[in-house]
Amino acid sequence: MPFIYINILLAFFISFIGLLMYRSHLMSSLLCLEGMMLSLYILGTLLCLNMHFTLSAMIPMILLVFAACEAAVGLALLVMVSNTYGLDHVQNLNLLQC
């Protein structure tokens, strides 16, 4: 296994561990999710280029679109929670029920 794949997988797992450890604030959770999506995008792109998968070349772009949608929804939720409660704690998300 090439060294770059190990680095990208290590970046994914570090972001995942960060998501598990720093889950009290919504902003840190969103940053860890973005790190995970970025490492998955790079890994998918490298695999498509190195394995010559011409039919699946659109999969990394689709993943990037979903990452952008996830970031937009996460930031909108962060703005709504911080305007309503003044904090960005994840525990305030349970209070947003109708």
UniProtKB/Swiss-Prot annotation:
Membrane topology: Multi-pass membrane protein
Localization annotation: Mitochondrion inner membrane
Gene Ontology biological process terms from the UniProt entry: ATP synthesis coupled electron transport
GO terms for MF: NADH dehydrogenase (ubiquinone) activity
Transmembrane region(s): 1-21, 29-49, 61-81
Leader sequence segment: none
EC number assigned by the record: 7.1.1.2
Keyword list, A-Z: Electron transport, Membrane, Mitochondrion, Mitochondrion inner membrane, NAD, Respiratory chain, Translocase, Transmembrane, Transmembrane helix, Transport, Ubiquinone
Keyword Transmembrane helix: yes
Cellular component per GO, a single term: respiratory chain complex I
Reactions catalysed according to its record: a ubiquinone + NADH + 5 H(+)(in) = a ubiquinol + NAD(+) + 4 H(+)(out)
Cross-referenced Pfam families: Oxidored_q2 (PF00420)
Organism superkingdom: Eukaryota
Top class in the EC scheme: translocase
Subunit structure: Core subunit of respiratory chain NADH dehydrogenase (Complex I) which is composed of 45 different subunits.
Role noted for this protein: Core subunit of the mitochondrial membrane respiratory chain NADH dehydrogenase (Complex I) which catalyzes electron transfer from NADH through the respiratory chain, using ubiquinone as an electron acceptor. Part of the enzyme membrane arm which is embedded in the lipid bilayer and involved in proton translocation.
Family affiliation: Belongs to the complex I subunit 4L family.
Name the record gives this protein: NADH-ubiquinone oxidoreductase chain 4L
The species this protein was found in: Dugong dugon (Dugong)
Gene: MT-ND4L
